[in-house]
Amino acid sequence: IAGYMHDIGNAINRTHHAEYGGLLADGILKKTDMNIKDRITIVSAISNHDESTGGAVDLVSAALIIADKTDVRRDRVRSEKGKAAFDIHDRVNYAVTQHKLKVNVDKKTISLNLQIDTKICSMYEYFEIFLGRMMMCRGAADMLGATFKLMANGSKVL
């Protein structure tokens, strides 16, 4: 449920969308027969999933953070904008030509492997936008008792 609702706050504003999302989700979930403990877990995960204000506070928030922050790929970009209208976030996502997230339960690793077209976006630009997100994934993996690994264009980064 947290994963499904986590970006609902964008309906109000991109800035502080996690906090707005927590408030909106709480209002919606109050109308269900969900018990308070589960509702708090979901609202907390939504409220803490943004790198500017949040972090992993429990297993659910850790899983949400990893799922959200590792979702970097070309098809996230709406192509009708045209490349000339891409901002840096669009360009970074568009530059990712391959992505693979792998969880190895036995080795307790969560690995993200990206292939980035450096003709579209430099590695510097990628890390300017995504380093904080990848560090947040590392903290979330720690919360899950795992190690987060990042490979970009065949090179180990984290």
What role is predicted for each listed range?
Residues 1-103:
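Divalent metal-dependent catalytic cores for phosphoryl transfer on phosphate-bearing substrates
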